[in-house]
Structure formats: C-alpha cells, structure tokens
Curated annotation (Swiss-Prot):
PANTHER family in UniProt: COILED-COIL DOMAIN-CONTAINING PROTEIN 144A-RELATED
Family: Belongs to the CCDC144 family.
UniProt KW keywords: Coiled coil
Protein name: Putative coiled-coil domain-containing protein 144C
Amino acid sequence: MVSWGGEKRGGAEGSPKPAVYATRKTGSVRSQEDQWYLGYPGDQWSSGFSYSWWKNSVGSESKHGEGALDQPQHDVRLEDLGELHRAARSGDVPGVEHVLVPGDTGVDKRDRKKSIQQLVPEYKEKQTPESLPQNNNPDWHPTNLTLSDETCQRSKNLKVDDKCPSVSPSMPENQSATKELGQMNLTEREKMDTGVKTSQEPEMAKDCDREDIPIYPVLPHVQKSEEMRIEQGKLEWKNQLKLVINELKQRFGEIYEKYKIPACPEEEPLLDNSTRGTDVKDIPFNLTNNIPGCEEEDASEISVSVVFETFPEQKEPSLKNIIHSYYHPYSGSQEHVCQSSSKLHLHENKLDCDNDNKPGIGHIFSTDKNFHNDASTKKARNPEVVTVEMKEDQEFDLQMTKNMNQNSDSGSTNNYKSLKPKLENLSSLPPDSDRTSEVYLHEELQQDMQKFKNEVNTLEEEFLALKKENVQLHKEVEEEMEKHRSNSTELSGTLTDGTTVGNDDDGLNQQIPRKENGEHDRLALKQENEEKRNADMLYNKDSEQLRIKEEECGKVVETKQQLKWNLRRLVKELRTVVQERNDAQKQLSEEQDARILQDQILTSKQKELEMAQKKRNPEISHRHQKEKDLFHENCMLQEEIALLRLEIDTIKNQNKQKEKKYFEDIEVVKEKNDNLQKIIKRNEETLTETILQYSGQLNNLTAENKMLNSELENGKENQERLEIEMESYRCRLAAAVHDCDQSQTARDLKLDFQRTRQEWVRLHDKMKVDMSGLQAKNEILSEKLSNAESKINSLQIQLHNTRDALGRESLILERVQRDLSQTQCQKKETEQMYQSKLKKYIAKQESVEERLSQLQSENMLLRQQLDDVHKKANSQEKTISTIQDQFHSAAKNLQAESEKQILSLQEKNKELMDEYNHLKERMDQCEKEKAGRKIDLTEAQETVPSRCLHLDAENEVLQLQQTLFSMKAIQKQCETLQKNKKQLKQEVVNLKSYMERNMLERGEAEWHKLLIEERARKEIEEKLNEAILTLQKQAAVSHEQLAQLREDNTTSIKTQMELTVIDLESEISRIKTSQADFNKTKLERYKELYLEEVKVRESLSNELSRTNEMIAEVSTQLTVEKEQTRSRSLFTAYATRPVLESPCVGNLNDSEGLNRKHIPRKKRSALKDMESYLLKMQQKLQNDLTAEVAGSSQTGLHRIPQCSSFSSSSLHLLLCSICQPFFLILQLLLNMNLDPI
C-alpha cells in the first residue's frame, strides 16, 4: 500500500505529519492477490482506492512450493519495488523470489559504514535524528542500518528536508486505520518523494552486474512537475482571495485602514510572479513552520516544492531545467555503468554519480549562500528559536561524527543515546504561527489602550480648564448678585423712611382707609410670588429639558458604541473567512498534487512496460505470463486513476459549495455594514437637530436680552420724563399755595375792615340821633370795643399760626425735594451700574456662546473617538470568541481522533507483534532451508551448470533481504506509531495550555474593556453635567438679573408713586380748609381712578394666572410625552440589548441590535407639535395683551412700545408676559398723575 497525503492538526494551521505506506500483499508469485493502495487520507480524501490483480505465473510454484513463499502474504518495501519490476520484466523468477523471500543483504557492513561516513561530513548541519534508530527498541541491531537512513542523508544533498518516509505493512482489515495514520502535508510528500528516489538508486545499482540496466529515477521528476502545477494553482487561488479582500477593504474605507491589524512581515500582499526572486532566501517563513523535524533541523531546510515557488518569472525554463535534471541525473554517467559483480563499490559509485551529475539541482540552489541567508532571516524573525536549533544541530553533528568513527559492531547501539533528550527538548518547542498570532493580537490591544489613554488625558486637561473658567464665572456672578442685593436693601430702607414720614402727616390716615393700602400690598405680594413661581417653573422646565437631552445623547453614544463593536466583529469575520478560503485552497492544491502524481505514476509505468517489452523480445516464452500481469496492472491503474478523478471532482464540488457559502456570508456582512452605516447617519442627524435646537434657544435668549435692554432704555426715558413733570408740578403747587395764602389774608382783612366801618357809621348816626343815649351807653360801647379788640387779637394769633404752619410745610417740601434729588442721583448711579453690567453680561453671553460651540465640537470629537474605541473593542471580542469556538471544536476533534488513533494503534501493535513472531518463525524456517539448500547445492554443483548455482544463491540472498526488510519495516512502524502517540499527547497538552492562555487573555481583555468603557462613560457624563450646569447657571443668572431689574423698576416706581401720593395728600389737606367741595369731588375722582386701577390689576393678574396655568399644562404635557418616549426607548434598548456577564458590553453575536428601529424620529415629531402649540398660545397671548394695552393707553400721553418680534420658544413668551404687566401699571399711574392737572 502506497499513500501520500496531508493531515491537518491543531486547529486552523495544522502541523504536517508524514506517513508513507508501501505494502504489497502476495500469496505467491502466480496466484495470490496483489493489492496496492494509493490515497490521501484525512480531510483531502474521503476514501482510498484499491485495485487488485491476479498473477498466474507458470512454473514458479514447482520450484518454490515448499519455501517461504508459501506463506499467505509478503510485505515489500518501497525501495524494493524497482528491483521487483525489473526482475518481472526480464522474466527472472529467482530475482522475484529474491525480493520476496528474505535473505542476507550481501552488503559488507564496512561498505555501508563508509557510505554513511562519506555522506555525513558534507552536510553535518542537515542530519535528522528522527531517521536514526532508537536505543529503546530491543529488536534493533547495529548492523541493520536500513536504506531509509541512507536516503535521508542523500536527500540532504538535494536541499530537501530529511524526514524519511516511514514504511509499514498494512493489513486488509485495518485499511481505515491506515487512512487516518497516513496523513501528511505537501512538504512531507515531497520529502518522501525524494527519499523514494534516492532509496531506489542503490537497489537498482545492485543488479548492474547482471543486466547492465541504466539507473534513472522515474517517479520523482514526474511528481515534481505535478507539484509545480499544484503550486501554480495555489498562487492563482491566493491572488483571487487577496483581490476579494482588497475590494472589501476599499468598501469599508478609512475605518478598516485605520484599525486593521498589520500583516506579518514574512507574508507578501500578492503572490505575483514578479515579486519573487530566484534565491532560496526569498521563501516565506510560514512555509517552514509547523513541520515535524524542523525543530531538530536547521532553519534553512526547505522542501523542493517551496523552492519551486521562488521561480515564477522563469517558470518554464526553471521547470525544464529541473525536469531535465530529474530525467537525466545520470546522463553523463551512463558510461559509468557498474561492470563488476562485487557489491563493495556500490555506495562509492552511487556517491560519484550523485556528486558529478546534478546540473539541475546545482543550478537552482546555492547551498552556502542560501543556508546563511535563510538562517539569518529566521533569526531575525524568531531569534530565540533559531539559536536553540543551531546549537542543537551543532551538537548533533559532533556526536554523529564521533559515532561514525567508531566500530559498527560494538558502538552502534550507543551512538544515539545523547540525541534523545535533545530531540525531545527540540520537539517540545511551540510552533511559531500560534505565537505570532497571539503576539500580534496582544500588540494591537496595547496600541489601542495607549491611544485611548492619550485621548482621555487630553480630554481631562480640557475639562479641567473649562471647570476653572466656570468657577471664575460663578464667582463673578455671585459678586454681582451681592451688589444687587445691597442696592435693593438700600432702596427698601429709603422706602421705609418715606412711609414713616408720610405716616406722620395729620389728615392722611383719615382720608384714605388703611384697608385699601393693605389690599394693595397684598396684591403686589401675590404678583411677586406668582412671578417667582413662574421663574421657578421655567427653571424646572429648562432643567428637565436639559436632562432629557443628556439622556438622548447618552443613548446615541451607546448606539454608536454598539455599531462600532459590530463593525469590528464584521472585520474579524472577514478575516476568518479569508483564512478558511486559504485552507480550502491548500486542500485543493493537495488534491491536484495527488492527481498529478497519479498521472506521473501512469506515465512511469507505461515507460517501464515499454522498456520491459524491449528486453522481453529475446525471452518471450518465459515472460508472456508476466506481460499479461503488467497489462492487468495497467488496467487497474487506469481504473484507479478514474476513481481518483471522480474523487477530485467531488472535492472540487465541495470546495465550490464552500466558496458559495463564504460569498453568501460576505454578502450578509456587507448588508449588516450598510445597515450600521444608515443607523450612524440617523444618529448624526439627531445630533445635528439637537445642536440646532440648542443654538436656536441661545439665539432666542440673546434676542430676549436685546429686547429687555430696549425695554429698560424706554423705562429710563419714561422715568426721566416723569421726573421732569414732577418738578414742574411741584413748582406750580408752590406758586398756587403762595397765591392762596395771600388772597385768603387779604379777604379776611377786607371783611373785618368793612364790618368795623359799618359799625362805626351806625354808632356815629346813633350819636347824632341819640346824643343823649351815647353818654348812657358809653360803658356798653367800651365793652364792645374791648370785645372787638379781643377778636382782632385772636385773628392776629390765627394769622401767626397760619404763618407757622406754612413755614413747617415749606420745610417739609424742602426735605422732600432733597430726598428726590438724592433718589435721582441714586437712580442715575444705578442706571450706570446697570448699563455697565448689561455690557458685561452681553460680553459674557457672547463668550458663553463661543464656549458652547467649542464644547459641542469637543463633544463631537469625543463621540467619534469613543466610537473608534468601541469598534476596536468589538472586533477584539469577536476575534476572541471565534478563536475560542475554533479551539473548542479543534480540541474536541483532536480528542476524538486521538482516541480513535490510540485504539487503532493498539490493534496494530497487536497485529504487528503477531506478524513479528510469525516472521521470526519464518526466519528460523529460512535458516533451516538455507542449510538444507547449501547441502543440496553442494550435491547439485556437479550436475547443474554454474549459472543455476549463481541464480539460486541470489534467490536465497533476496529472500533473506526480504525478511530483513520486512522486520525493519515492522520496527519502523512501531517507532512511528510510538512517535505518533507522543505527538498526539503533546498536541493535546499544547491545545489545553493554549486554551487556558486564551481564556486568561480574554478575561484580561474584557476587564480592560470594562474599565475603559466605565472611564469613558464617567468622563462623558461629567462633561455633559458640567456643560449642563454652566448652561443652567447662565440661564439662572439671566433670569435673576431680569427679576432684579423688574424688582428695581417696580420698587422705584412704587416709591415715586408713594411720594407723589404723599405730596398730593398734603396739598389736598391744605386746600381742604378753603375748598371742601372741590376737595370732595377730587377725592371721589381719585377713588374712582384707584378702583379702576385695582380692577385693571385684577384683570391682569387673572390673565397672568391663566397664562401660567396654560404654560403649566403645556409643560406637564411635554414631560408626559418625554417620559413616554423615554420609556419606549428604554424598553427597546432593553429588548435589543444582549445578555453577557458584564453589564456594560452587549453580546456582539446578537443580530437583533443591527435591525432594530430607530426611535428619535418620533421624538422629533412630538417636539415639533409642541413648538407649534406654544407658538399658537404665544400669538393668542400677544393679541390679548396688545388689545388690553391699546384700550388702557388711549388717553395717555406716552405709550409704551410693544414687542414687535416674538421668539418661537416658550421662555421668551413667559418673559414678555411677565414684563408687560409692569409697563401697564406704569402707564395707568402716569394717567392718574396727569388727570388732575
């Protein structure tokens, strides 16, 4: 049974394991069945191919009916097949029996020793300890140095890895087990081919004395040409795959280019024909990894198939040279055919032929240069492994040279004792491919961590600077607030002083009832409380809106993070798909190699048949039966080729199906990527809309501030007008009072003078009439005069009292004027302060707007960075999960295969032991037969010609050689089985350790990921909170400033009105003595005006309460809708969020997160509806307020300018509604002051 194949072990990249089985099972030369098995076990070939033919040789059983060939089966080595075919072609029945029956090798031990010593010094560094026998085998003998060892050493001259093919007899019952154990990689197949070629040469040279047949290797050169075709197919597949990967990279764009894992320096982007040189040092490093025996051999040992990959530009000429070298390796030495019958010089002739006639191989390889270059490149890639290997190789070479110089009889069993621990140490080294993949993953994780840490540090520094600026702004605002409070306390103190002065007046408390003043104060307090409540409501609304927007931003950030994780996972999936495609291509290439090898075998067999026919013409009578057998063999080979082609077609179909599946997976991945990009665009749109809303609100606030400034300026102008009018009123009042006093005194004097004159006239008449009565009445008249004098005195006293009262009133007026001048000065100072503060606030608002824009840009950058970080983390998690799944599956498969192999090995060991015992018995029989035949030969020498004696001797020698070869094959099978066991155990241990390492690394990666996400979330939350706090504080400061301005305006107006009322009441009290009726009418008029004012205020308060209620309803509706939308979004987030061990990271394998609906569209519609509703309410309130103001201000001289432009926000509407009632009150008070004048 002959099999070539490759086996994949250890997961994604399998370490190859060579196994070659060459078994021929014959019961006898003429009648038993010969079975040949050629297969590729493992993943590449699903079943082997067997063919059998029957040989019917005539006359052979009569000669050897009682010999060893009567046994049911014969095990033939692969090296003896050439000799057996030559003997069959020539009709040499004794030669065939010589191959099938064991006998003495006929080769001197010293000659074999010399040939090995000639081979070893030339290539010390390429010695393979695995090909040497082990001391642990008790059946091994120092003289039984097999030809496989020689072939391994000869293969070193061809720059081929010295992994000798293991030869084992295969039983028909256990062909399935041999399929599993016969797996090997392409490189080992090439090694086996070169070993077969070199091993066939000495056996061909043995018969040079007899038949003068030229020695040439047929199978290897055909195999090499087929391997070149396979390598071409491999290159085409790899180029196609890399083109597909490049297209995918271009579609992904900058994301993949930014976060892709750098390829290994040993691998090239495309295996084009122009990128490879003609030197062996350009061979990729990955081709020599994971090959058993590479740990013991030198780093520069490269298989022939790999060397052919380095000559693509000169593919045809190099192939011709190589094929020519393999077809005619001894083209110049055909004259040097062996002519002597002795076998002592076989090895010398063989070495001469090999060393003198190899133009093709010397043409391709530069041994010294390539050796050093390859060793240096391997050290650059993996310095630790190379140094160990070189040391081990040097020690091995020294030991080999020492052992070869000793005697072969005494020291051969102890030659390799020192090599076993070294080989075990070298075999325990881990493969480079697994290490490099782990190193690249670890380095990528470290780079991502460092990038993220740097970004976080920069963000922390920026936020610390922003915090410092916010603290300074808060300090300035607090200082300004304290100044405002001090000013308000001073104003309240002046107001209280004015009220105490007014309370000291005499007739005020009697004229105006205290109840009305109390009600007026209560109404004012209620209005102030309502205004404060409105301000609190506005503040709460703004805070709720900001909080909701924070939550929305957090959700957007989470969605972006999930999208980035998904993108990374898709990138990793693409990489795994590419790896699987590469594996499939390798399988296809190996299958093509098998097909090409079968074609080569056919061609070689046909050539052998032609040569045999040429030689058989003189001996047709003896070889007619053998020609029939060869014809049957040819037919069976053709059938086998047909079966192999069928299997190749089936494997191709399977590979096509796999490719279709991979393309479908790639399309699914593309669709997922498109969906993710759409979701990212939607999130960006929502972010832009939120930013526009914030900017609109800021613009509205600036417009409101401008309106308030204009209103303040108008109020200042109105105050100045009122002050001018008050001064004119005071001057007029003073003149009127003075005129009234003078007129009253003049009138009183005139009336008194007229009365006295009338009385004097009457008395004078009476004196004239009654001169007599006057004297009697003188006393009465004197009394009357005294009474008149007392009256005059009383009138004079009254005049003095009135003059004193006027002086007091003048003093009071002077005091009032002084207070007015002081208040005017204070007003001017406060106005200046307000103007300066307004300017500062405007500048601060501009700076705050700039900072807000900067914060928004920084937030966008942070979100982008977070998206990038989450994408990386997602891709890493995906790779870890896929690697774990692959390792679990690989571990399970390996365990199952190891169990099967152990069982099959146990069974085979039993069978081999049985065969070994059987062969021992056979050897004993052969020795007995040999002794009997020697006696028969001595008797037959007299009668039989010398040629028969020679043929019998050769027959016996061949029989002994066959038995020895079968024994050695059994020993090698046992050794290979033990090695396979050890290798399987080591692979299981390595896989377990690798799984544990991966689990630990995954735990560490998840822990680092959680820490990074928590830090990022905390920082983002802190930054958002800080930005929101700054906005809230600025809004609160602006609201407080507006409230303070309003309070100042209202307090100033109230004080002015109270002063005017006090002055008017004093004037009324003075005028009341002379003009009671006029004063009564005036009081009634004032009362009516006051009642109208109270009604107007009540109506305005009712309207304000209505507006506040409407705003409260709107705010409640908004909060309810926002809570509903928030609950929906949370519900969808929880529904789509996958479950993992960590709470922060979602399951990346969940596909629902990619197809879920986007929620913020509904939010936008709700917000638009609420804004339209608020606009309608604002228009209604504006119309009502303008109508009321127009109705109340028709009779006034000065009208307050109405707000011409209204913003679309609810905050501006509330500010306008709060400001308008104060202007209405001022207008009504002005009307009250102007009506009496």
